[in-house]
Amino acid sequence: MELNLEIVTTPLRPAATVVMLRDAPVGLEVFLMKRHTLSDVLGGAYVFPGGKVDAADTEIDMAAYLDQPLRLLHAGLNEADISERTAGGLYVAALREAFEESGVLFAQGFATLDIDAVRAATLLREGHGFNAVLARMALRLQTRSLVPWSRWITPTAPSVMNKRFDTRFFVSAVPAGQVAIHDNHETTDSIWLSPRSALQQYWAGQIELAPPQIMSLAHLARHAAVDSVLSAARGRRPPVIQPEPFDHGGQRVICYPGDTRHSVSEQALPGPTRLSYRNKRFEPDAGFEALFL
């Protein structure tokens, strides 16, 4: 992964990501997709489904198409400085991006619990917008399926891209009976891996990961099952992670809350408090196992 040294002063773009999980014989697994190599955001890297908030995400009739009142969604994010509608839009964006990028539809019918995700995907390909698909199929989005996990704010020195995002990460169990798959447009490959296996493949040079994915996978690796992740997420406030990069001896270092160089002294995530850029990738100074200490 190439290092970006550009300073970016453009406003933050609100975004949302869904970390989809499942229980497998080997334990907890997470869904990752490979961004198209020509993408202007993390091209070639493996990421969780997600993207920026669109205007339509906040324009939807939330009382009709969401399964929870906005006040509960707002409370779940624990962000006093945003409106309830903005909070609702973040949930909608997360669910929309999950569907558009992986084909997984977190929804239920108004009159039945059954949904036809294949038909919904067909309508989307035919040019119907996400909100129109919900209306046409009489679907209500299942915001209860999402639990806020963390909030990542890109610094003005992004290190791996030239855009800045204010991204809310949600965790969720993939719905039973649905198959997550890359869209062959924005993403070109997809895989289910245990968090540790994903990091092992990254360490071996088999896949590329950006720092937020590295740190998130290291966090998830501490859990053995989906219920453990969801329970932990429900039992705490989603931490705000604003990385603070600096250069040390000609080497780019990204530090996180709790690091001696970070402005926030309290550690927000388990694992290392800094990653250093070596061999065209970011890694902890103490080696691979430091991700799990």
Where are these regions (language model features)?
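N-terminal leader/linker segments that precede catalytic domains of diphosphate-processing enzymes
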Residues: 1-293
